[in-house]
Amino acid sequence: MRIANIRLTKEEKKMKRTDQEKKKPSPGELVHIMIDRPMNSYHPEHKDLFYPVNYGYIEGIIAPDGEEQDVYVLGIDHPVKEFTGKVIAIIHRLNDVEDKWVAVPEDMTMTAQEIMEQVRFQEQYFETEIEMLE
């Protein structure tokens, strides 16, 4: 069996991004997130990548990478297994096919700068733009 290393062209990335925009959450939409990387844990494959925030996915929403939609959970100060909160932003990775959603407790707001300060630990490796939904 041969395994091919497939790279997306800029046009293919643009098409995937357009498809993903169709799945964009509504401002303040409530979502239920399954946490697979709790706050104060390490990435399962990249052992030196420490997660200072809770990070997980939304079951049933498939992102362009074929996996369930990834979400940063901000605004809580302890590890959790699940979380229900509102989506306030999308972090667009301009040099990758993935976008990350940002969720917070219902009564909370954050600025793009505050979001980037908390997700820089991982997003520093990508060219990103933050789209605020509120």
Short names for language-model regions:
Residues 3-134:
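Hydrophobic N-terminal alpha-helices or hydrophobic patches in metabolic proteins across all domains
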